[in-house]
Amino acid sequence: MFILVSVVNICTYIHLHMFPLISTFTSIGLGVLMKDKGKEGKTIKAQNVTYQTFEKYVESSSFFFLVHNFLNSSTMKTLLLMSNNNSISEIPSFSVLKILWKNGIYIAHI
């Protein structure tokens, strides 16, 4: 699992930094995973997650999985999985999503 995560992280880094326009306008899925302290694979659910609460979630957790894919030609759906319990949380659709590296984790910016 950890090796797969490392490969995804490396591919994601190359994809976003070498081909930023392609990564924004293709339907290629994107996954980023941080390893929690002894609790790998746990997720969290929140109701109506907003961009502001997403930032707070990222700051408060050492583990999250971010994946996005196009719902249609103009919108993107983003899912956020975190380590506190066993459900899934959804971020509202963005027309453009950019992922930045900060303090060892990926953070979404509009």
Curated annotation (Swiss-Prot):
- Keyword Transmembrane helix attached: yes
Q: Does the keyword Repeat apply?
A: no
Q: After gene disruption, what is the outcome? A: No increased sensitivity to hydroxyurea.
The subcellular location is: Membrane
Q: Which GO terms describe its biological process?
A: DNA replication; double-strand break repair via nonhomologous end joining; homologous recombination; macroautophagy
- Principal subcellular localisation of the protein: membrane
* Membrane topology field: Single-pass membrane protein
Kindly state one GO CC term assigned in the UniProt record: membrane
Q: Which residues cross the membrane?
A: 18-34
Q: Which UniProt keywords apply?
A: Membrane, Transmembrane, Transmembrane helix
Protein name as it appears in the record:
Putative uncharacterized protein HUR1
Look up and give the organism this protein is from. Answer: Saccharomyces cerevisiae (strain ATCC 204508 / S288c) (Baker's yeast)
